[in-house]
Amino acid sequence: MDKDYSAPNFLGESSGGNDDNSSGMIDYMFNRNLQQQQKQSMPQQQQHQLSPSGFGATPFDKMNFSDVMQFADFGSKLALNQTRNQDDQETGIDPVYFLKFPVLNDKIEDHNQTQHLMPSHQTSQEGGECGGNIGNVFLEEKEDQDDDNDNNSVQLRFIGGEEEDRENKNVTKKEVKSKRKRARTSKTSEEVESQRMTHIAVERNRRKQMNEHLRVLRSLMPGSYVQRGDQASIIGGAIEFVRELEQLLQCLESQKRRRILGETGRDMTTTTTSSSSPITTVANQAQPLIITGNVTELEGGGGLREETAENKSCLADVEVKLLGFDAMIKILSRRRPGQLIKTIAALEDLHLSILHTNITTMEQTVLYSFNVKITSETRFTAEDIASSIQQIFSFIHANTNISGSSNLGNIVFT
């Protein structure tokens, strides 16, 4: 032929390892058919176009019998190229990789099958470059999609595994909590009833012991200190009785001290001259021996001060506590007839209103407790009140021992 025509090599060059003779014979077979078709109908510009199947533009139904037989003879050679590609790809696969990620095995096999079905390289001098580029672009896009799918599958597998582990842990924690709660609340009705009866028995025993203690406490006090048989009355009466016992202790101490002072006083009276009057002798005996005072300012009491004063003599021991216009007076002395009435009258003459009176006696000793309120506008001190009470008992003692009367109205505060 005068004119050399180079047709694209569509088959036999995908791996680049086939013989030159086989490729040349295939090229000759297709070139002869293309030349005949081009001379008859096809224009010069459409000679290099590709069919959708990857072969030349000549359809298979227009090929003669000899061409078909030649194509069938070279089919086995073309198959060798595919098996070689398959062997090359299979040798590069690591089986351990499939053991680690079994989900990816199917996708890799699908990828290999797509590569076997499609030609890897299609080159020609004019039209082969276009077909090769299209095939390479398609394969690259396919590989990118497969890689993305593989990565997504791996990520989904890892995420799914972590979520499963978390769900399993949450399930186990819930089971443990449910077991603990069941263990705490798993009480039968018999156990609940037994616990309730135990509480009732303990409370009953406590009340029984409390009532027993109150009964013993009530038996130790006189009946006058307990007006009612309830718990508050018994405890209140016991407190009052203890206070009275403290006052009685003071009375006994004062009586003992008076006896000592009385003996010394008798010795002093025997040595006095006969010219001395009885009034003078009584006045000397009634002179106070101990006078003490104390002033305490109360915190938060609105500026009020609590004053305490004591005035002790052989006739009486006087203790006064003054807070504002309220005072508490305690007098410990020997029992004398008419002494209480005279004392109350003298206190009223001193403008002291008596609010409460308590009397405790033991043999010949008596303890007077007065709660009084100062009604006069004159401000008195605790020491003034104690000194005035000592004068009152001096006159009472003198009036008792000496026939005659004593004018109590002349007693004033010194």
Swiss-Prot record:
Gene3D superfamilies: Helix-loop-helix DNA-binding domain. Induction: Inhibited by low relative humidity (LRH) via epigenetic CG methylation, thus leading to a reduced stomatal index. The keyword Transcription regulation applies. The keyword Transcription regulation applies. A motif (LxCxE motif) lies at residues 249-253. Residues 12-24, 35-49 have a biased composition (Low complexity). One of its GO terms (molecular function) is DNA binding. It comes from the Eukaryota. Residues 176-185 have a biased composition (Basic residues). SUPFAM superfamilies: HLH, helix-loop-helix DNA-binding domain (SSF47459). Disruption phenotype: Excess symmetric divisions during stomata development leading to abnormal guard cells clusters formation. Reduced seeds set and low biomass. These phenotypes are complemented by MYB124. Disulfide bonds: none annotated. One of its GO terms (biological process) is positive regulation of cell differentiation. One of its GO terms (cellular component) is nucleus. Interacts with FAMA through its LxCxE motif. Self-interacts. Also interacts with bHLH071 and bHLH093. Interacts with RBR1. Transcription activator. Together with MYB88 and MYB124, ensures that stomata contain just two guard cells (GCs) by enforcing a single symmetric precursor cell division before stomatal maturity. Together with SPCH and MUTE, regulates the stomata formation. Required to promote differentiation and morphogenesis of stomatal guard cells and to halt proliferative divisions in their immediate precursors. Mediates the formation of stomata. Prevents histone H3K27me3 marks and derepresses stem cell gene expression. This is Transcription factor FAMA. The lineage of its organism: Eukaryota, Viridiplantae, Streptophyta, Embryophyta, Tracheophyta.
